[in-house]
Protein backbone atom coordinates (compact mmCIF):
# COMPACT_ATOMS: atom_id res chain seq x y z
CA UNK A 1 0.00 0.00 0.00
CA UNK A 2 1.40 3.33 -1.07
CA UNK A 3 1.37 5.98 1.64
CA UNK A 4 0.32 9.51 0.74
CA UNK A 5 2.89 11.90 2.12
CA UNK A 6 1.81 13.56 5.36
CA UNK A 7 -1.64 12.14 4.92
CA UNK A 8 -2.20 8.58 3.77
CA UNK A 9 -1.41 5.66 1.43
CA UNK A 10 -2.38 3.57 -1.55
CA UNK A 11 -2.46 0.04 -2.87
CA UNK A 12 -1.65 0.03 -6.54
CA UNK A 13 -1.97 -1.91 -9.74
CA UNK A 14 -2.95 -1.06 -13.28
CA UNK A 15 -6.48 -1.60 -14.47
CA UNK A 16 -5.39 -4.98 -15.76
CA UNK A 17 -3.75 -5.98 -12.47
CA UNK A 18 -0.15 -5.66 -13.62
CA UNK A 19 2.37 -5.15 -10.82
CA UNK A 20 3.99 -1.71 -11.04
CA UNK A 21 6.55 0.06 -8.90
CA UNK A 22 6.71 3.47 -10.58
CA UNK A 23 4.45 6.31 -11.64
CA UNK A 24 5.12 8.84 -14.42
CA UNK A 25 3.36 12.09 -13.50
CA UNK A 26 3.70 13.36 -17.06
CA UNK A 27 2.07 10.34 -18.72
CA UNK A 28 0.17 8.02 -16.39
CA UNK A 29 -3.52 8.27 -15.58
CA UNK A 30 -4.39 7.80 -11.91
CA UNK A 31 -7.44 6.46 -10.06
CA UNK A 32 -7.48 6.72 -6.25
CA UNK A 33 -9.91 5.04 -3.89
CA UNK A 34 -10.25 6.88 -0.60
CA UNK A 35 -11.45 10.04 1.10
CA UNK A 36 -11.23 12.74 -1.56
CA UNK A 37 -10.18 15.51 0.82
CA UNK A 38 -7.18 13.52 2.03
CA UNK A 39 -6.40 12.38 -1.50
CA UNK A 40 -6.41 16.00 -2.73
CA UNK A 41 -3.99 16.96 0.03
CA UNK A 42 -1.85 14.01 -0.96
CA UNK A 43 -1.73 15.18 -4.58
CA UNK A 44 -1.03 18.83 -3.79
CA UNK A 45 2.75 18.78 -3.65
CA UNK A 46 3.04 16.62 -6.76
CA UNK A 47 0.39 18.24 -8.97
CA UNK A 48 0.00 21.86 -7.81
CA UNK A 49 -0.41 24.09 -10.87
CA UNK A 50 -0.47 21.14 -13.29
CA UNK A 51 -4.19 20.41 -13.75
CA UNK A 52 -5.66 22.12 -16.81
CA UNK A 53 -9.31 21.39 -16.04
CA UNK A 54 -11.36 20.23 -13.06
CA UNK A 55 -14.91 18.94 -13.42
CA UNK A 56 -16.90 17.76 -10.41
CA UNK A 57 -20.43 16.58 -9.86
CA UNK A 58 -20.66 16.73 -6.04
CA UNK A 59 -23.57 15.50 -3.89
CA UNK A 60 -26.31 18.08 -4.32
CA UNK A 61 -27.43 18.13 -0.66
CA UNK A 62 -31.03 17.23 -1.49
CA UNK A 63 -31.44 13.91 0.28
CA UNK A 64 -32.47 12.43 -3.08
CA UNK A 65 -29.13 12.09 -4.80
CA UNK A 66 -27.90 8.53 -5.07
CA UNK A 67 -24.37 9.48 -4.04
CA UNK A 68 -23.62 7.34 -1.03
CA UNK A 69 -22.20 10.33 0.76
CA UNK A 70 -24.19 12.14 3.43
CA UNK A 71 -26.39 13.82 0.86
CA UNK A 72 -28.55 15.74 3.31
CA UNK A 73 -26.30 18.06 5.25
CA UNK A 74 -27.63 21.31 6.60
CA UNK A 75 -26.49 24.20 4.43
CA UNK A 76 -23.56 25.19 6.62
CA UNK A 77 -22.18 21.64 6.90
CA UNK A 78 -22.49 21.10 3.16
CA UNK A 79 -20.72 24.37 2.41
CA UNK A 80 -17.85 23.50 4.78
CA UNK A 81 -17.66 20.09 3.10
CA UNK A 82 -17.34 21.81 -0.29
CA UNK A 83 -15.07 24.63 0.90
CA UNK A 84 -12.40 22.27 2.22
CA UNK A 85 -12.20 20.47 -1.10
CA UNK A 86 -12.43 23.47 -3.41
CA UNK A 87 -9.60 25.28 -1.64
CA UNK A 88 -7.20 22.42 -2.31
CA UNK A 89 -8.50 21.87 -5.84
CA UNK A 90 -7.84 25.53 -6.65
CA UNK A 91 -4.15 25.04 -5.85
CA UNK A 92 -3.96 22.16 -8.31
CA UNK A 93 -5.22 24.22 -11.27
CA UNK A 94 -2.73 25.59 -13.78
CA UNK A 95 -2.70 29.34 -14.46
CA UNK A 96 -4.68 28.78 -17.66
CA UNK A 97 -7.00 26.22 -16.05
CA UNK A 98 -10.73 26.23 -15.34
CA UNK A 99 -13.00 24.49 -12.84
CA UNK A 100 -16.53 23.35 -13.73
CA UNK A 101 -19.02 22.42 -11.00
CA UNK A 102 -22.38 20.74 -11.62
CA UNK A 103 -25.09 21.70 -9.14
CA UNK A 104 -28.87 21.99 -8.98
CA UNK A 105 -30.94 25.01 -8.01
CA UNK A 106 -31.20 23.96 -4.37
CA UNK A 107 -27.60 24.89 -3.55
CA UNK A 108 -26.41 26.79 -6.63
CA UNK A 109 -26.75 30.26 -5.08
CA UNK A 110 -24.99 29.25 -1.87
CA UNK A 111 -22.25 27.54 -3.87
CA UNK A 112 -21.79 30.62 -6.07
CA UNK A 113 -21.14 32.83 -3.03
CA UNK A 114 -18.74 30.26 -1.58
CA UNK A 115 -16.89 29.82 -4.88
CA UNK A 116 -16.61 33.59 -5.37
CA UNK A 117 -14.87 33.77 -2.01
CA UNK A 118 -12.42 30.98 -2.83
CA UNK A 119 -11.77 31.61 -6.51
CA UNK A 120 -12.47 35.35 -6.70
CA UNK A 121 -15.65 36.80 -8.20
CA UNK A 122 -13.53 38.30 -10.97
CA UNK A 123 -12.65 34.76 -12.10
CA UNK A 124 -16.27 33.70 -12.57
CA UNK A 125 -16.80 33.03 -16.27
CA UNK A 126 -20.49 32.12 -16.39
CA UNK A 127 -23.27 29.78 -15.34
CA UNK A 128 -24.30 27.14 -17.85
CA UNK A 129 -27.86 25.81 -17.82
CA UNK A 130 -28.05 22.14 -18.80
CA UNK A 131 -31.43 20.68 -19.76
CA UNK A 132 -31.15 17.39 -17.89
CA UNK A 133 -34.77 16.31 -18.46
CA UNK A 134 -37.25 16.89 -21.26
CA UNK A 135 -40.53 15.39 -20.01
CA UNK A 136 -42.52 17.08 -17.21
CA UNK A 137 -43.29 15.17 -14.01
CA UNK A 138 -47.02 15.77 -13.61
CA UNK A 139 -47.03 14.62 -9.98
CA UNK A 140 -45.20 17.83 -9.04
CA UNK A 141 -47.42 20.47 -7.44
CA UNK A 142 -45.51 23.58 -8.55
CA UNK A 143 -42.74 23.13 -11.12
CA UNK A 144 -41.19 20.10 -12.75
CA UNK A 145 -37.46 20.79 -12.74
CA UNK A 146 -35.78 20.21 -16.05
CA UNK A 147 -32.31 21.72 -15.65
CA UNK A 148 -29.15 21.82 -13.58
CA UNK A 149 -26.38 24.40 -13.51
CA UNK A 150 -22.66 24.28 -14.20
CA UNK A 151 -20.61 27.04 -12.55
CA UNK A 152 -17.42 27.86 -14.45
CA UNK A 153 -14.39 29.67 -13.01
CA UNK A 154 -10.99 30.47 -14.51
CA UNK A 155 -7.80 30.32 -12.45
CA UNK A 156 -6.80 33.62 -14.02
CA UNK A 157 -9.55 35.49 -15.84
CA UNK A 158 -7.36 38.07 -17.52
CA UNK A 159 -8.66 40.08 -20.46
CA UNK A 160 -7.04 37.59 -22.82
CA UNK A 161 -8.79 34.54 -21.31
CA UNK A 162 -10.60 32.43 -23.89
CA UNK A 163 -12.22 29.03 -23.80
CA UNK A 164 -11.87 26.70 -26.73
CA UNK A 165 -14.62 26.85 -29.33
CA UNK A 166 -17.12 24.23 -30.35
CA UNK A 167 -16.87 22.63 -33.78
CA UNK A 168 -19.12 24.19 -36.40
CA UNK A 169 -22.10 22.04 -37.22
CA UNK A 170 -22.58 20.95 -40.82
CA UNK A 171 -25.70 23.09 -41.13
CA UNK A 172 -23.72 26.15 -40.00
CA UNK A 173 -21.09 25.58 -42.67
CA UNK A 174 -23.82 24.93 -45.24
CA UNK A 175 -25.18 28.45 -44.70
CA UNK A 176 -21.99 29.89 -46.23
CA UNK A 177 -22.33 30.33 -50.01
CA UNK A 178 -20.29 31.70 -52.92
CA UNK A 179 -22.84 32.96 -55.48
CA UNK A 180 -20.32 35.17 -57.32
CA UNK A 181 -17.47 32.64 -57.33
CA UNK A 182 -15.20 34.74 -55.14
CA UNK A 183 -11.74 33.07 -55.11
CA UNK A 184 -11.59 33.47 -51.31
CA UNK A 185 -14.31 30.86 -50.98
CA UNK A 186 -17.71 30.67 -49.31
CA UNK A 187 -19.05 33.54 -47.23
CA UNK A 188 -22.08 34.86 -45.40
CA UNK A 189 -23.66 38.05 -46.72
CA UNK A 190 -24.12 40.06 -43.51
CA UNK A 191 -26.47 43.00 -43.18
CA UNK A 192 -24.75 46.26 -44.13
CA UNK A 193 -27.06 48.44 -42.00
CA UNK A 194 -27.07 48.71 -38.20
CA UNK A 195 -29.05 50.62 -35.62
CA UNK A 196 -29.35 52.97 -33.94
CA UNK A 197 -28.23 55.36 -36.63
CA UNK A 198 -24.82 57.06 -36.60
CA UNK A 199 -25.17 60.30 -38.56
CA UNK A 200 -21.77 60.22 -40.26
CA UNK A 201 -22.50 56.72 -41.61
CA UNK A 202 -25.65 57.77 -43.44
CA UNK A 203 -24.71 58.25 -47.07
CA UNK A 204 -25.94 57.22 -50.49
CA UNK A 205 -24.60 54.05 -52.14
CA UNK A 206 -24.96 53.35 -55.85
CA UNK A 207 -25.44 49.68 -56.76
CA UNK A 208 -23.77 48.17 -59.88
CA UNK A 209 -27.16 48.42 -61.61
CA UNK A 210 -27.22 52.19 -60.94
CA UNK A 211 -29.86 52.19 -58.16
CA UNK A 212 -29.33 54.72 -55.36
CA UNK A 213 -29.65 53.17 -51.87
CA UNK A 214 -29.86 54.70 -48.38
CA UNK A 215 -29.99 52.78 -45.08
CA UNK A 216 -33.51 52.15 -43.66
CA UNK A 217 -35.05 54.79 -41.38
CA UNK A 218 -33.43 54.76 -37.95
CA UNK A 219 -30.38 52.91 -39.25
CA UNK A 220 -27.01 53.79 -40.73
CA UNK A 221 -24.46 51.81 -42.69
CA UNK A 222 -22.16 49.53 -40.69
CA UNK A 223 -19.05 51.29 -42.04
CA UNK A 224 -17.93 54.83 -42.76
CA UNK A 225 -17.91 56.00 -46.40
CA UNK A 226 -14.12 55.72 -46.51
CA UNK A 227 -14.19 52.16 -45.18
CA UNK A 228 -16.99 51.27 -47.62
CA UNK A 229 -14.83 52.41 -50.54
CA UNK A 230 -11.99 50.17 -49.32
CA UNK A 231 -14.30 47.16 -48.97
CA UNK A 232 -15.81 47.80 -52.41
CA UNK A 233 -12.36 47.92 -53.99
CA UNK A 234 -11.52 44.60 -52.29
CA UNK A 235 -14.74 42.96 -53.58
CA UNK A 236 -16.09 42.53 -50.04
CA UNK A 237 -19.48 44.11 -50.77
CA UNK A 238 -22.22 42.00 -52.38
CA UNK A 239 -25.22 43.52 -54.19
CA UNK A 240 -27.08 40.33 -55.06
CA UNK A 241 -26.95 38.25 -58.22
CA UNK A 242 -28.40 41.01 -60.38
CA UNK A 243 -26.33 43.81 -58.79
CA UNK A 244 -29.52 45.65 -57.77
CA UNK A 245 -29.94 44.67 -54.10
CA UNK A 246 -29.00 46.64 -50.99
CA UNK A 247 -25.34 46.05 -50.07
CA UNK A 248 -24.19 43.15 -47.88
CA UNK A 249 -20.83 42.56 -46.23
CA UNK A 250 -18.97 39.38 -47.18
CA UNK A 251 -17.86 37.42 -44.09
CA UNK A 252 -15.61 34.64 -45.41
CA UNK A 253 -15.58 31.28 -43.63
CA UNK A 254 -11.82 31.05 -44.18
CA UNK A 255 -11.35 34.23 -42.12
CA UNK A 256 -13.68 33.36 -39.26
CA UNK A 257 -12.12 31.85 -36.14
CA UNK A 258 -12.29 28.07 -36.07
CA UNK A 259 -15.40 26.90 -34.27
CA UNK A 260 -18.14 28.82 -32.50
CA UNK A 261 -18.36 30.33 -29.03
CA UNK A 262 -20.39 28.19 -26.64
CA UNK A 263 -23.71 29.54 -25.41
CA UNK A 264 -24.88 29.20 -21.82
CA UNK A 265 -27.99 27.14 -22.60
CA UNK A 266 -27.21 23.51 -23.39
CA UNK A 267 -30.22 21.53 -24.56
CA UNK A 268 -30.64 17.80 -24.26
CA UNK A 269 -30.57 17.49 -28.05
CA UNK A 270 -27.01 18.85 -28.00
CA UNK A 271 -25.45 17.19 -24.94
CA UNK A 272 -27.87 14.50 -23.77
CA UNK A 273 -30.06 14.15 -20.69
CA UNK A 274 -30.25 11.98 -17.58
CA UNK A 275 -31.99 9.09 -19.30
CA UNK A 276 -29.29 8.99 -21.98
CA UNK A 277 -26.69 8.71 -19.23
CA UNK A 278 -28.53 5.85 -17.52
CA UNK A 279 -28.84 4.01 -20.83
CA UNK A 280 -25.09 4.36 -21.36
CA UNK A 281 -24.42 2.73 -18.00
CA UNK A 282 -26.97 -0.03 -18.56
CA UNK A 283 -25.44 -0.88 -21.93
CA UNK A 284 -22.10 -1.48 -20.21
CA UNK A 285 -23.49 -3.63 -17.38
CA UNK A 286 -25.90 -6.05 -19.03
CA UNK A 287 -28.92 -3.81 -18.67
CA UNK A 288 -28.44 -3.18 -14.95
CA UNK A 289 -28.78 0.32 -13.48
CA UNK A 290 -25.34 0.09 -11.89
CA UNK A 291 -25.24 3.78 -10.92
CA UNK A 292 -28.15 6.11 -10.24
CA UNK A 293 -26.91 9.58 -11.23
CA UNK A 294 -24.45 9.42 -14.13
CA UNK A 295 -23.89 12.27 -16.55
CA UNK A 296 -24.16 11.70 -20.32
CA UNK A 297 -20.85 11.38 -22.14
CA UNK A 298 -21.83 14.12 -24.59
CA UNK A 299 -22.14 16.59 -21.72
CA UNK A 300 -18.65 15.80 -20.46
CA UNK A 301 -17.34 15.83 -24.04
CA UNK A 302 -18.51 19.42 -24.44
CA UNK A 303 -17.01 20.46 -21.11
CA UNK A 304 -13.63 18.92 -21.94
CA UNK A 305 -13.73 20.37 -25.46
CA UNK A 306 -14.15 23.89 -24.09
CA UNK A 307 -11.69 23.65 -21.21
CA UNK A 308 -8.82 21.39 -22.30
CA UNK A 309 -6.71 20.14 -25.19
CA UNK A 310 -5.22 16.76 -26.01
CA UNK A 311 -2.72 15.51 -23.41
CA UNK A 312 -3.93 18.03 -20.81
CA UNK A 313 -4.54 16.75 -17.27
CA UNK A 314 -8.19 16.60 -16.13
CA UNK A 315 -9.24 16.02 -12.49
CA UNK A 316 -12.57 14.78 -11.12
CA UNK A 317 -12.56 14.12 -7.37
CA UNK A 318 -16.23 13.06 -7.19
CA UNK A 319 -15.59 10.36 -9.76
CA UNK A 320 -18.82 8.39 -9.40
CA UNK A 321 -19.34 6.10 -12.38
CA UNK A 322 -16.17 7.44 -14.09
CA UNK A 323 -17.90 9.29 -16.93
CA UNK A 324 -15.27 12.05 -16.82
CA UNK A 325 -12.41 9.57 -16.98
CA UNK A 326 -14.07 7.51 -19.74
CA UNK A 327 -14.58 10.58 -21.91
CA UNK A 328 -11.10 11.92 -21.12
CA UNK A 329 -9.59 8.65 -22.31
CA UNK A 330 -11.63 8.72 -25.52
CA UNK A 331 -10.60 12.36 -26.12
CA UNK A 332 -6.90 11.74 -25.41
CA UNK A 333 -6.76 13.68 -22.16
CA UNK A 334 -4.81 12.54 -19.12
CA UNK A 335 -6.86 12.17 -15.95
CA UNK A 336 -6.97 11.76 -12.19
CA UNK A 337 -10.11 10.36 -10.59
CA UNK A 338 -10.89 10.05 -6.87
CA UNK A 339 -13.75 8.07 -5.34
CA UNK A 340 -14.26 6.78 -1.81
CA UNK A 341 -17.27 4.50 -2.28
CA UNK A 342 -17.05 0.77 -2.88
CA UNK A 343 -18.78 1.00 -6.28
CA UNK A 344 -15.40 2.12 -7.61
CA UNK A 345 -14.56 -1.59 -7.89
CA UNK A 346 -17.93 -2.68 -9.34
CA UNK A 347 -18.74 0.25 -11.63
CA UNK A 348 -16.00 2.86 -12.07
CA UNK A 349 -12.94 0.70 -12.71
CA UNK A 350 -14.82 -1.94 -14.75
CA UNK A 351 -16.20 0.85 -16.92
CA UNK A 352 -12.71 2.13 -17.66
CA UNK A 353 -11.55 -1.38 -18.43
CA UNK A 354 -14.35 -1.61 -20.99
CA UNK A 355 -13.22 1.72 -22.48
CA UNK A 356 -9.70 0.33 -22.85
CA UNK A 357 -11.20 -2.71 -24.57
CA UNK A 358 -12.92 -0.41 -27.08
CA UNK A 359 -16.58 -0.27 -25.98
CA UNK A 360 -18.71 1.62 -28.50
CA UNK A 361 -21.21 3.42 -26.25
CA UNK A 362 -21.45 7.11 -25.43
CA UNK A 363 -19.24 9.26 -27.69
CA UNK A 364 -17.15 6.34 -28.98
CA UNK A 365 -18.49 6.43 -32.53
CA UNK A 366 -18.34 10.25 -32.68
CA UNK A 367 -14.61 10.23 -31.92
CA UNK A 368 -13.85 6.93 -33.70
CA UNK A 369 -12.75 5.31 -30.44
CA UNK A 370 -10.95 2.01 -31.02
CA UNK A 371 -9.78 1.27 -27.49
CA UNK A 372 -6.39 1.48 -25.83
CA UNK A 373 -4.94 3.45 -22.95
CA UNK A 374 -4.17 2.56 -19.35
CA UNK A 375 -4.40 3.84 -15.80
CA UNK A 376 -2.81 3.25 -12.42
CA UNK A 377 -5.22 2.26 -9.65
CA UNK A 378 -4.40 3.11 -6.03
CA UNK A 379 -6.16 2.83 -2.68
CA UNK A 380 -5.50 4.90 0.38
CA UNK A 381 -4.13 2.48 2.98
CA UNK A 382 -6.85 2.42 5.68
CA UNK A 383 -6.04 2.67 9.36
CA UNK A 384 -8.98 3.93 11.38
CA UNK A 385 -11.03 4.01 8.17
CA UNK A 386 -11.31 0.23 8.27
CA UNK A 387 -12.60 0.32 11.83
CA UNK A 388 -14.96 3.16 10.96
CA UNK A 389 -16.49 1.16 8.11
CA UNK A 390 -16.86 -1.85 10.40
CA UNK A 391 -18.71 0.27 12.97
CA UNK A 392 -20.98 1.80 10.35
CA UNK A 393 -21.85 -1.58 8.83
CA UNK A 394 -22.35 -3.44 12.12
CA UNK A 395 -25.84 -4.96 12.18
CA UNK A 396 -26.36 -5.65 15.88
CA UNK A 397 -24.92 -5.02 19.32
CA UNK A 398 -22.84 -8.21 19.39
CA UNK A 399 -21.14 -7.29 16.11
CA UNK A 400 -20.51 -3.80 17.47
CA UNK A 401 -18.89 -5.25 20.61
CA UNK A 402 -16.62 -7.37 18.44
CA UNK A 403 -15.50 -4.32 16.46
CA UNK A 404 -14.84 -2.42 19.71
CA UNK A 405 -12.65 -5.25 21.03
CA UNK A 406 -10.63 -5.27 17.81
CA UNK A 407 -10.28 -1.48 17.98
CA UNK A 408 -8.61 -1.82 21.37
CA UNK A 409 -6.57 -4.97 20.77
CA UNK A 410 -5.72 -4.86 17.07
CA UNK A 411 -6.68 -8.52 16.76
CA UNK A 412 -6.99 -9.63 13.11
CA UNK A 413 -5.83 -6.19 11.87
CA UNK A 414 -2.19 -6.09 13.10
CA UNK A 415 -2.69 -2.75 14.84
CA UNK A 416 -5.24 -1.24 17.27
CA UNK A 417 -7.22 1.84 16.34
CA UNK A 418 -6.05 5.39 17.01
CA UNK A 419 -8.43 6.58 19.72
CA UNK A 420 -9.18 10.30 19.88
CA UNK A 421 -7.50 12.01 22.83
CA UNK A 422 -10.89 13.56 23.58
CA UNK A 423 -12.53 10.15 23.91
CA UNK A 424 -13.88 8.95 27.24
CA UNK A 425 -13.95 5.15 27.17
CA UNK A 426 -15.95 5.09 30.39
CA UNK A 427 -18.96 6.34 28.44
CA UNK A 428 -19.22 3.04 26.58
CA UNK A 429 -22.22 1.34 28.18
CA UNK A 430 -23.61 -1.59 26.26
CA UNK A 431 -26.91 -1.25 28.10
CA UNK A 432 -27.54 2.01 26.24
CA UNK A 433 -28.41 0.09 23.13
CA UNK A 434 -27.18 -0.35 19.59
CA UNK A 435 -27.65 3.10 18.01
CA UNK A 436 -26.18 5.08 20.92
CA UNK A 437 -23.10 2.87 21.14
CA UNK A 438 -22.56 3.01 17.39
CA UNK A 439 -22.54 6.81 17.66
CA UNK A 440 -20.06 6.68 20.55
CA UNK A 441 -17.71 4.30 18.74
CA UNK A 442 -17.61 6.59 15.73
CA UNK A 443 -16.66 9.47 18.03
CA UNK A 444 -13.90 7.38 19.63
CA UNK A 445 -11.94 7.08 16.40
CA UNK A 446 -9.33 9.75 15.73
CA UNK A 447 -10.38 11.21 12.37
CA UNK A 448 -6.78 12.32 11.74
CA UNK A 449 -5.83 8.65 11.69
CA UNK A 450 -8.22 7.36 9.04
CA UNK A 451 -5.27 6.43 6.80
CA UNK A 452 -1.57 5.77 7.33
CA UNK A 453 0.69 8.78 6.84
CA UNK A 454 3.55 8.75 4.36
CA UNK A 455 5.77 10.04 7.16
CA UNK A 456 5.23 6.65 8.85
CA UNK A 457 6.33 4.55 5.89
CA UNK A 458 9.72 3.66 7.39
CA UNK A 459 8.33 2.91 10.87
CA UNK A 460 8.79 -0.81 11.47
CA UNK A 461 5.15 -1.47 12.39
CA UNK A 462 4.02 0.20 9.16
CA UNK A 463 6.80 -1.13 6.92
CA UNK A 464 5.87 -4.66 7.94
CA UNK A 465 2.32 -4.09 6.67
CA UNK A 466 3.18 -3.14 3.10
CA UNK A 467 4.78 -5.06 0.27
CA UNK A 468 8.14 -4.19 -1.23
CA UNK A 469 6.37 -3.20 -4.47
CA UNK A 470 4.08 -0.78 -2.65
CA UNK A 471 6.99 0.65 -0.69
CA UNK A 472 8.95 1.26 -3.90
CA UNK A 473 5.91 2.74 -5.61
CA UNK A 474 5.47 5.28 -2.80
CA UNK A 475 9.11 6.26 -2.83
CA UNK A 476 8.93 6.76 -6.59
CA UNK A 477 5.69 8.73 -6.41
CA UNK A 478 6.84 11.16 -3.75
CA UNK A 479 10.61 11.20 -3.91
CA UNK A 480 11.42 10.21 -7.47
CA UNK A 481 12.58 6.79 -6.37
CA UNK A 482 15.08 7.93 -3.72
Predicted regions and their residues:
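Mobile active-site "lid"/loop adjacent to the S-adenosyl-L-methionine
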Residues: 52, 59-81, 94-96
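Accessory, often C-terminal, charged low-complexity segments
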Residues: 1-5, 23, 28, 44-48, ...
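Short amphipathic alpha-helices and their capping/turn segments at secondary-structure boundaries
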Residues: 36-54
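Conserved proline-anchored active-site loop of SAM-dependent methyltransferases
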Residues: 49-64, 115, 314-328, 381
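Short glycine/proline-rich turn/loop motifs
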Residues: 17-28, 65-70, 275-288
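Conserved SAM-binding loop and adjacent beta-strand
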Residues: 287-298
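Core domains of carbohydrate- and sulfate-ester-processing enzymes
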Residues: 1-17
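Conserved beta-strand signature within the Rossmann-like core of class I S-adenosyl-L-methionine
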Residues: 97-102
Amino acid sequence: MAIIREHSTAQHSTAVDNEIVSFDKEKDNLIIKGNNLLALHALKNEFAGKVRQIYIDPPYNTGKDSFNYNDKFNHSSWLVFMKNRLEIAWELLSDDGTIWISIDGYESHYLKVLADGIFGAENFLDEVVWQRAYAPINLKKTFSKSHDYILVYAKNNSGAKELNRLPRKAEMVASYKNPDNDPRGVYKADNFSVGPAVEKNIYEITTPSGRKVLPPDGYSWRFSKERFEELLADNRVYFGKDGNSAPSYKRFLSEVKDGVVAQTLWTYQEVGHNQDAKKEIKSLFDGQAAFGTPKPEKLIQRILTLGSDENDLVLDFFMGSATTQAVAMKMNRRFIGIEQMDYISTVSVPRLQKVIEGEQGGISKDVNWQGGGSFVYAELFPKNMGYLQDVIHAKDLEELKSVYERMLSGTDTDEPADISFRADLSKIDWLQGFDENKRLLVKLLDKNGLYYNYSEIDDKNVRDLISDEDYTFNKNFYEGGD
